[in-house]
Amino acid sequence: MRMARTPFQQGEYMKSIIGLSLLLLLTGCGIRTEVVRVNVPDIRVNPEEGPVVVVGPVRDVRPVYYPEVAAADRAKNLAGVVRQGNGVLVSIESTTAADKTRAIMIQALRNMGYRTADQCETSCTQLEASLTDFSVKMPANFFRMVSSTQQMLADISVQVVARKEGQTRTFTATGHGANIFQVPSRENWEIALERAVKSFTSSLQQSMSEQDATAGSKAQD
Protein backbone atom coordinates (compact mmCIF):
# COMPACT_ATOMS: atom_id res chain seq x y z
CA MET A 1 0.00 0.00 0.00
CA ARG A 2 1.44 3.36 -1.05
CA MET A 3 2.05 5.77 1.80
CA ALA A 4 0.50 9.23 1.50
CA ARG A 5 2.96 12.06 0.97
CA THR A 6 3.51 14.44 3.83
CA PRO A 7 2.92 18.17 3.16
CA PHE A 8 6.71 18.64 3.02
CA GLN A 9 7.11 15.83 0.47
CA GLN A 10 4.26 17.22 -1.60
CA GLY A 11 5.92 20.63 -1.57
CA GLU A 12 9.27 19.21 -2.65
CA TYR A 13 7.56 17.18 -5.39
CA MET A 14 5.81 20.27 -6.71
CA LYS A 15 9.10 22.20 -6.69
CA SER A 16 10.76 19.50 -8.79
CA ILE A 17 7.88 19.50 -11.28
CA ILE A 18 7.92 23.30 -11.50
CA GLY A 19 11.68 23.39 -11.93
CA LEU A 20 11.63 20.75 -14.64
CA SER A 21 8.74 22.45 -16.45
CA LEU A 22 10.58 25.76 -16.44
CA LEU A 23 13.77 24.17 -17.75
CA LEU A 24 11.89 22.40 -20.52
CA LEU A 25 10.41 25.78 -21.43
CA LEU A 26 13.92 27.23 -21.53
CA THR A 27 15.76 24.51 -23.39
CA GLY A 28 13.40 21.88 -24.68
CA CYS A 29 15.89 19.21 -23.63
CA GLY A 30 19.49 19.08 -22.49
CA ILE A 31 21.87 21.90 -21.64
CA ARG A 32 22.68 24.80 -23.92
CA THR A 33 24.84 27.90 -23.56
CA GLU A 34 23.48 31.45 -23.72
CA VAL A 35 26.08 34.13 -24.49
CA VAL A 36 25.21 37.52 -22.99
CA ARG A 37 26.61 41.02 -23.28
CA VAL A 38 27.57 42.87 -20.08
CA ASN A 39 27.94 46.58 -20.71
CA VAL A 40 30.17 49.00 -18.83
CA PRO A 41 27.81 51.89 -17.93
CA ASP A 42 28.35 55.63 -18.37
CA ILE A 43 31.70 55.48 -20.21
CA ARG A 44 33.81 58.64 -19.87
CA VAL A 45 37.40 59.51 -20.71
CA ASN A 46 40.11 59.13 -18.11
CA PRO A 47 40.44 62.46 -16.22
CA GLU A 48 43.69 64.32 -16.90
CA GLU A 49 43.81 65.42 -13.28
CA GLY A 50 42.59 63.95 -10.03
CA PRO A 51 43.81 61.44 -7.45
CA VAL A 52 45.55 58.49 -9.07
CA VAL A 53 44.31 54.95 -8.54
CA VAL A 54 45.80 51.73 -9.85
CA VAL A 55 43.42 48.79 -10.30
CA GLY A 56 45.42 45.59 -10.50
CA PRO A 57 44.28 42.48 -12.37
CA VAL A 58 41.16 41.04 -10.76
CA ARG A 59 41.59 37.55 -9.32
CA ASP A 60 38.75 35.16 -10.13
CA VAL A 61 38.12 33.13 -6.98
CA ARG A 62 34.50 32.24 -7.70
CA PRO A 63 33.31 28.70 -7.02
CA VAL A 64 32.54 26.31 -9.86
CA TYR A 65 28.82 26.99 -10.28
CA TYR A 66 28.04 23.79 -12.20
CA PRO A 67 30.24 20.74 -12.89
CA GLU A 68 28.81 20.71 -16.43
CA VAL A 69 30.93 23.80 -17.23
CA ALA A 70 34.17 22.78 -18.96
CA ALA A 71 37.35 23.98 -17.26
CA ALA A 72 38.26 26.08 -20.31
CA ASP A 73 34.90 27.89 -20.12
CA ARG A 74 34.78 28.67 -16.40
CA ALA A 75 36.42 32.11 -16.67
CA LYS A 76 33.50 33.24 -18.86
CA ASN A 77 30.72 31.31 -17.14
CA LEU A 78 28.13 33.28 -15.16
CA ALA A 79 26.30 30.22 -13.80
CA GLY A 80 22.73 29.95 -15.14
CA VAL A 81 20.16 27.32 -14.24
CA VAL A 82 20.64 23.54 -14.48
CA ARG A 83 18.39 20.90 -12.95
CA GLN A 84 18.05 17.20 -13.70
CA GLY A 85 20.32 17.40 -16.74
CA ASN A 86 18.45 20.27 -18.39
CA GLY A 87 19.06 23.98 -18.39
CA VAL A 88 21.03 26.98 -19.58
CA LEU A 89 24.65 27.86 -18.87
CA VAL A 90 25.16 31.61 -19.22
CA SER A 91 28.48 32.85 -20.59
CA ILE A 92 29.84 36.39 -20.92
CA GLU A 93 30.59 37.65 -24.41
CA SER A 94 34.12 38.43 -25.69
CA THR A 95 35.98 38.55 -22.37
CA THR A 96 36.25 36.94 -18.94
CA ALA A 97 34.21 37.77 -15.86
CA ALA A 98 37.35 39.01 -14.09
CA ASP A 99 38.39 41.33 -16.93
CA LYS A 100 34.86 42.70 -17.27
CA THR A 101 34.77 43.36 -13.52
CA ARG A 102 38.03 45.31 -13.74
CA ALA A 103 36.66 47.39 -16.64
CA ILE A 104 33.52 48.18 -14.61
CA MET A 105 35.62 49.17 -11.59
CA ILE A 106 37.89 51.44 -13.66
CA GLN A 107 34.94 53.27 -15.21
CA ALA A 108 33.22 53.68 -11.84
CA LEU A 109 36.38 55.26 -10.42
CA ARG A 110 36.83 57.57 -13.40
CA ASN A 111 33.27 58.77 -12.95
CA MET A 112 34.21 59.70 -9.37
CA GLY A 113 37.06 61.88 -10.62
CA TYR A 114 39.89 59.41 -10.15
CA ARG A 115 42.61 59.17 -12.78
CA THR A 116 43.29 55.51 -13.37
CA ALA A 117 46.80 54.32 -14.20
CA ASP A 118 48.60 51.05 -14.87
CA GLN A 119 51.29 51.80 -12.31
CA CYS A 120 51.94 54.22 -9.48
CA GLU A 121 54.62 56.85 -10.14
CA THR A 122 53.94 59.03 -7.09
CA SER A 123 51.39 58.87 -4.28
CA CYS A 124 48.35 56.86 -5.29
CA THR A 125 45.76 54.35 -4.16
CA GLN A 126 46.36 50.76 -5.20
CA LEU A 127 43.44 48.36 -5.37
CA GLU A 128 43.71 44.58 -5.24
CA ALA A 129 40.43 42.89 -6.11
CA SER A 130 39.16 39.32 -5.82
CA LEU A 131 35.98 38.36 -7.65
CA THR A 132 33.94 36.07 -5.40
CA ASP A 133 30.65 36.09 -7.33
CA PHE A 134 29.48 37.08 -10.80
CA SER A 135 26.47 34.97 -11.61
CA VAL A 136 22.88 34.75 -12.74
CA LYS A 137 20.20 32.34 -11.63
CA MET A 138 16.51 31.62 -11.95
CA PRO A 139 14.99 30.31 -8.70
CA ALA A 140 12.00 27.99 -9.06
CA ASN A 141 8.99 29.47 -7.29
CA PHE A 142 5.50 28.01 -7.67
CA PHE A 143 3.59 31.22 -6.91
CA ARG A 144 5.74 33.30 -9.26
CA MET A 145 5.40 30.72 -12.01
CA VAL A 146 1.60 30.52 -11.88
CA SER A 147 1.38 34.34 -11.75
CA SER A 148 3.90 34.79 -14.62
CA THR A 149 6.29 36.75 -12.41
CA GLN A 150 9.33 34.46 -12.56
CA GLN A 151 12.58 36.26 -11.78
CA MET A 152 16.03 36.22 -13.27
CA LEU A 153 18.57 37.30 -10.64
CA ALA A 154 22.13 38.56 -11.06
CA ASP A 155 24.80 39.10 -8.39
CA ILE A 156 28.31 40.54 -8.29
CA SER A 157 30.62 40.52 -5.28
CA VAL A 158 34.22 41.74 -5.12
CA GLN A 159 36.56 41.81 -2.13
CA VAL A 160 38.85 44.85 -2.36
CA VAL A 161 42.08 45.70 -0.57
CA ALA A 162 42.94 49.42 -0.84
CA ARG A 163 46.50 50.52 -0.04
CA LYS A 164 47.81 54.07 0.19
CA GLU A 165 50.86 55.50 1.94
CA GLY A 166 51.24 52.54 4.28
CA GLN A 167 47.56 52.38 5.17
CA THR A 168 45.41 49.39 4.24
CA ARG A 169 41.64 49.05 4.19
CA THR A 170 39.46 46.19 3.02
CA PHE A 171 35.85 46.25 1.89
CA THR A 172 33.40 44.26 -0.20
CA ALA A 173 31.50 45.84 -3.09
CA THR A 174 28.32 44.05 -4.13
CA GLY A 175 25.63 44.38 -6.74
CA HIS A 176 22.23 42.74 -7.19
CA GLY A 177 19.78 42.87 -10.06
CA ALA A 178 16.39 41.26 -10.68
CA ASN A 179 14.22 41.04 -13.76
CA ILE A 180 10.66 39.70 -13.90
CA PHE A 181 10.20 37.96 -17.24
CA GLN A 182 7.55 36.19 -19.26
CA VAL A 183 9.82 34.96 -22.07
CA PRO A 184 13.22 33.40 -21.25
CA SER A 185 15.70 35.13 -23.53
CA ARG A 186 19.20 36.57 -23.75
CA GLU A 187 17.77 40.06 -23.45
CA ASN A 188 16.09 39.26 -20.14
CA TRP A 189 19.32 37.86 -18.67
CA GLU A 190 21.05 41.05 -19.79
CA ILE A 191 18.49 43.27 -18.04
CA ALA A 192 19.17 41.53 -14.72
CA LEU A 193 22.93 41.85 -15.31
CA GLU A 194 22.66 45.53 -16.21
CA ARG A 195 20.87 46.23 -12.93
CA ALA A 196 23.47 44.26 -10.97
CA VAL A 197 26.28 46.24 -12.61
CA LYS A 198 24.65 49.56 -11.68
CA SER A 199 24.13 48.35 -8.12
CA PHE A 200 27.75 47.17 -7.92
CA THR A 201 29.03 50.48 -9.30
CA SER A 202 27.14 52.39 -6.62
CA SER A 203 28.45 50.09 -3.88
CA LEU A 204 32.05 50.48 -5.07
CA GLN A 205 31.79 54.26 -5.29
CA GLN A 206 30.30 54.49 -1.80
CA SER A 207 33.09 52.33 -0.36
CA MET A 208 35.75 54.40 -2.12
CA SER A 209 34.21 57.61 -0.75
CA GLU A 210 34.42 56.13 2.73
CA GLN A 211 38.02 55.13 1.98
CA ASP A 212 38.86 58.73 1.04
CA ALA A 213 37.17 60.09 4.16
CA THR A 214 39.06 57.66 6.39
CA ALA A 215 42.39 58.45 4.73
CA GLY A 216 41.76 62.19 5.06
CA SER A 217 40.86 61.87 8.73
CA LYS A 218 44.04 59.92 9.51
CA ALA A 219 46.15 62.44 7.59
CA GLN A 220 44.85 65.24 9.84
CA ASP A 221 45.62 63.36 13.08
Which sequence ranges carry the predicted segments?
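Short acidic, gly/pro-rich beta-turn/loop elements at beta-sheet edges
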Residues: 63-66, 139, 168-170, 183
